[in-house]
Amino acid sequence: KAYELAGGAGFWGAETDVRMTKDKKFILQHDLTFKRLCGVDKKPEDMTLSEIQKLTIKSGNNISKYKNVKSATTVATLEDYLTTCKKYNMVPVIEIKMEFVEYGNETTNDSRMQAVTKNNMEDLYALTNHIMGNKEYMFIAYDFETMVQMRKVLDDNATTSTNVKLQHVTNNPDQGMINYYKKRKIELDANCDKISLSDIKAFNDRG
């Protein structure tokens, strides 16, 4: 519902967080578990999509106003979000709330993140590309290696179009990373309060 309202208000784009269910479906979910929003202390990766869609969102901004609206009280899928963005010509900004691992059974460095393999990321790209086509969209992540792997996915699919952008989100911009960003065609996404004029100049000078 939030994205329908954003689209109706004429927003340029809309950011969301994506996690993966037990049966490898992509849903919109920021938190590690559903406890805060739905009162259920379970992780997305421990539930199937069918089980998750039986949950009811009970907490959140203005939830009382939309408590009888299904699209506001049901956990949305990536398909729901992308379809809405496309309908309203909004740019989807998809934060991959996951961390790349080689085989899928490793522990992530950040305990707040799910483990994600390159195959999972290929599925994420394929679904997004299927719905959005040549329209602009973005993948972002705090984990740099996740963005590197998504670049490999794009390259494997011969995706040279400028409609797909990758951004590494960080609260600690590092000028030493400029060459890595440039080589892999990954942009910097940093909080304006965390980046200096020197950082901005260095990144601009390198294109």
Predicted regions and their residues:
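Phosphate-group recognition and catalysis centered on beta-loop-alpha active-site segments
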Residues: 1-207
